[in-house]
């Protein structure tokens, strides 16, 4: 069905570019030591390549776990990118991706993936760093103290933007001025400039 499609959409072209510039072998090599193998009982794990592609697609389109699961059913382009044929198999569910993201976070692999992609882009001359644009984005958090300890998260602080006060953190994002590609992301308390 997908191969008979005549018009290539913007999403198709975007995912083709992501396919071309992403060092998939390096990403798999970085994650493989921590990824579960199919040696035990129960359902065998979904292939690492497929989970990485699903994770990258989720990040590119800013989707939630449920959102990427739905997108796999809705979008031929994303299905083709991830490598799923719905006539033969079902898409991985949101919980599977959640567990994969937790695995990446637990072993600090998200930073390794980010650095591998940026290193690969720099090698290909796609990340020039002739100038950097830095912006800070507020990430709101609930100011509630209704948790187990009865305390606020010590990493969160108040910050004022205009006349409005916010509670949470800031993401300081560095972007290459020429290409627009993100090369640095640092999270700090909300009161850090």
Show the residue positions of the predicted features:
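Secondary-structure capping and boundary motifs in well-ordered enzyme cores
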Residues: 23, 43-48, 60, 88-92
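Polybasic low-complexity intrinsically disordered regions
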Residues: 49, 66, 70-73, 82-83, ...
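Short N-terminal amphipathic alpha-helices
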Residues: 27-30, 44-46, 63-72
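Short, solvent-exposed alpha-helical "recognition" segments
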Residues: 78-80
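Charged, often Cys/His-bearing segments associated with DNA-binding zinc-finger transcription factors
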Residues: 1-25, 29
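Short, Lys/Arg-enriched N-terminal segment that forms or immediately precedes the first helix
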Residues: 32-43
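Alpha-helical support elements that line or immediately flank enzyme active sites
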Residues: 50-62
């Amino acid at each position: 069905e997908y191969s008979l499609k005549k018009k290539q959409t913007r999403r198709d072209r975007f995912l083709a570019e992501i396919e071309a510039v992403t060092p998939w072998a390096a990403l798999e090599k970085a994650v493989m030591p921590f990824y579960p193998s199919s040696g035990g009982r129960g359902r065998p794990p979904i292939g690492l390549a497929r989970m990485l592609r699903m994770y990258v697609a989720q990040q590119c389109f800013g989707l939630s776990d449920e959102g990427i699961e739905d997108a796999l059913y809705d979008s031929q382009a994303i299905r083709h990118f991830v490598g799923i044929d719905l006539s033969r198999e079902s898409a991985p569910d949101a919980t599977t991706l959640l567990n994969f993201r937790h695995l990446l976070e637990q072993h600090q692999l998200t930073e390794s993936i980010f650095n591998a992609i940026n290193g690969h882009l720099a090698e290909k001359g796609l990340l020039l760093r002739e100038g950097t644009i830095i912006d800070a984005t507020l990430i709101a958090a609930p100011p509630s103290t209704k948790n187990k300890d009865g305390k606020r998260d010590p990493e969160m602080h108040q910050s004022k933007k205009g006349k409005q006060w916010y509670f949470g953190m800031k993401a300081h994002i560095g972007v290459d001025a020429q290409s627009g590609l993100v090369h640095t992301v640092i999270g700090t308390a909300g009161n850090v400039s």
